[in-house]
């Protein structure tokens, strides 16, 4: 029977970052960790010989070429992590991306594969950040109702067995056309559960994959974004009254109109 400890695979660009990340985890949770392994991030190089690979990824028509290359690199890096799990035949596998930041005490390995963090969005992913998802998850494992919501981002994925990792690896290789990895996992409904509250968030920084702002992905993944405000309708702005002073915004003497100066 496998030891009930984590085998952690950290995707990052160099060994120095890996050593720092793994050291922090070991310092606090040595009793819960069996092994940590570095998975080098994949920085793909576009040449005249391989530019056809850009057509393999299904994206919006206006997606920048640089972003497509990064998303393909993300898929390639996760394939390497899955292959490492298969090669090592490890259980209780936690795949972390470089920006995964531990938010709560590391729990004991869950009994099933799950998201250990992410962003909960509507079933139509294009409505993410626009339509609010109203759910009240309990502490621990929660079932994903794909008719009501999906989870995107791939910074912390928990895969229970090497067999499951092998199955997922096969799924990422077979398609003629690929999707961004998080969209692919959501559309395939690969993970059936998520752990709440989020064990890992994306730390505040500019994402190397999607160029999002420094804090945006942090708030999206903090408790799965359930407490994050969604975009509302545009507020109507009051028009200035005619004849109002542009310098001091003062009202005309004797005017009964309310001051409409923007504050």
Model-derived features: positions:
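An acidic/histidine-cluster motif and surrounding catalytic segment
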Residues: 2-96, 100-239, 262
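Small-residue-biased low-complexity repeat regions
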Residues: 232, 239, 243-244, 248-249, ...
């Amino acid at each position: 029977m496998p030891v009930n400890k984590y085998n952690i695979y950290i995707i990052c660009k160099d060994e120095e970052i890996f050593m720092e990340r793994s050291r922090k985890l070991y310092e606090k949770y040595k009793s819960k960790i069996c092994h940590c392994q570095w998975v080098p991030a994949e920085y793909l190089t576009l040449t005249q010989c391989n530019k056809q690979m850009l057509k393999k990824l299904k994206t919006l028509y206006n997606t920048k070429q640089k972003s497509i290359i990064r998303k393909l690199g993300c898929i390639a890096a996760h394939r390497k992590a899955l292959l490492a799990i298969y090669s090592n035949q490890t259980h209780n596998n936690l795949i972390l991306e470089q920006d995964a930041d531990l938010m709560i005490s590391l729990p004991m390995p869950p009994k099933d594969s799950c998201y250990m963090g992410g962003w909960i969005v509507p079933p139509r992913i294009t409505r993410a950040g626009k339509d609010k998802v109203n759910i009240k998850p309990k502490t621990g494992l929660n079932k994903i109702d794909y008719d009501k919501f999906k989870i995107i981002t791939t910074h912390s994925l928990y895969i229970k067995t090497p067999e499951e990792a092998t199955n997922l690896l096969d799924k990422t290789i077979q398609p003629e056309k690929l999707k961004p990895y998080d969209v692919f996992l959501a559309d395939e409904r690969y993970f059936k559960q998520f752990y709440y509250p989020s064990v890992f968030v994306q730390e505040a920084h500019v994402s190397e994959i999607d160029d999002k702002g420094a804090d945006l992905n942090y708030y999206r993944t903090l408790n799965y974004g359930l407490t994050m405000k969604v975009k509302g309708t545009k507020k109507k702005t009051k028009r200035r009254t005619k004849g109002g002073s542009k310098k001091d915004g003062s009202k005309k003497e004797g005017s009964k109109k309310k001051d409409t100066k923007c504050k």
